[in-house]
């Protein structure tokens, strides 16, 4: 085992990376409220794991979506637990994100030189809400259907460009299979990818600039 570690150490300098992480200075004013961002990240990772597990059984069609969710809940081993954890961690992620934003704002973490960190955080907040909107529709029950119909119909009030935006979101004039397909693609591929990219940027900037000082 030692020889394997030495082989990787010689090429990747693992110990130097570990020492840099461990030796990072943590200001004395940091308290439990500074952990809210990390908790949000943990919830996201739980979402990815449980969501990936459900993709093996979920069917993104208007005819089979609801039945496939019921199948996950009743027939798949621990399916009820996986979906429940997915839902609970989704709610927790939104709550922790909101509390994290308040903490950063109240402690002045958005001020120079951390403006870009704040911008990426706001983008992540928008992506988090988008997860909720797209995921809500996937069971394709009455609540999900009407939620999608209302949300995608909001831009219709915008003059000139409203109707094209609605059609872009729905995939057609009305809510149907193309809408579910688009929301499924957004929820399982586009949004996770964007979130991972912006989270990486967010944490790299925090790593570079450090945690903001007390007010």
UniProtKB/Swiss-Prot annotation:
Topology versus the membrane: Multi-pass membrane protein
Chief site of localization: plastid
Binding residue positions for heme b 2: 86, 187
Keywords attached to this entry: Chloroplast, Electron transport, Heme, Iron, Membrane, Metal-binding, Photosynthesis, Plastid, Thylakoid, Transmembrane, Transmembrane helix, Transport
Top-level taxon in the UniProt lineage: Eukaryota
GO cellular component, one term: chloroplast thylakoid membrane
Cofactor note: Binds 2 heme b groups non-covalently with two histidine residues as axial ligands.
Binding positions (heme c): 35
Keyword flag Membrane: yes
SUPFAM superfamilies given in the database record: Transmembrane di-heme cytochromes
Keyword Membrane part of the UniProt annotation: yes
Known cofactor(s): heme b; heme c
Molecular function as annotated in GO: electron transporter, transferring electrons within cytochrome b6/f complex of photosystem II activity; metal ion binding; oxidoreductase activity
Binding site for heme b 1: 100, 202
Subcellular location: Plastid, Chloroplast thylakoid membrane
HAMAP family registered for this protein in UniProt: Cytb6_f_cytb6
NCBIfam families recorded: PRK03735.1
Function, in words: Component of the cytochrome b6-f complex, which mediates electron transfer between photosystem II (PSII) and photosystem I (PSI), cyclic electron flow around PSI, and state transitions.
Protein family according to the UniProt entry: Belongs to the cytochrome b family. PetB subfamily.
UniProt-recorded name of the protein: Cytochrome b6
UniProt lineage: Eukaryota, Viridiplantae, Streptophyta, Zygnematophyceae, Zygnematophycidae
């Amino acid at each position: 085992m030692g020889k394997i570690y030495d082989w990787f150490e010689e090429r990747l300098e693992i110990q130097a990376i570990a020492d840099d992480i461990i030796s990072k200075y943590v200001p004395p004013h940091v308290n439990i409220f500074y952990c809210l961002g990390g908790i949000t990240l943990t919830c996201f990772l739980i979402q990815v794991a449980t969501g990936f597990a459900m993709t093996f059984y979920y069917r993104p069609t208007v005819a089979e979506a609801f039945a496939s969710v019921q199948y996950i809940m009743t027939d798949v081993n621990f399916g009820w637990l996986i979906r429940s954890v997915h839902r609970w961690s989704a709610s927790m992620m939104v709550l922790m994100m909101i509390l994290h934003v308040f903490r950063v704002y109240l402690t002045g973490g958005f001020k120079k030189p951390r403006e870009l960190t704040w911008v990426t955080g706001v983008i992540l907040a928008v992506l988090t809400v988008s997860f909720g909107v797209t995921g809500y529709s996937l069971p394709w029950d009455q609540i999900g259907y009407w939620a999608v119909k209302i949300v995608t119909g909001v831009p219709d009030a915008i003059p000139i460009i409203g109707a094209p935006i609605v059609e872009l979101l729905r995939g057609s004039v009305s809510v149907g299979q193309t809408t579910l397909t688009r929301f499924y693609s957004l929820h399982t591929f586009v949004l996770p990818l964007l979130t991972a990219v912006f989270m990486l940027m967010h944490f790299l900037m925090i790593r570079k600039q450090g945690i903001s000082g007390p007010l």
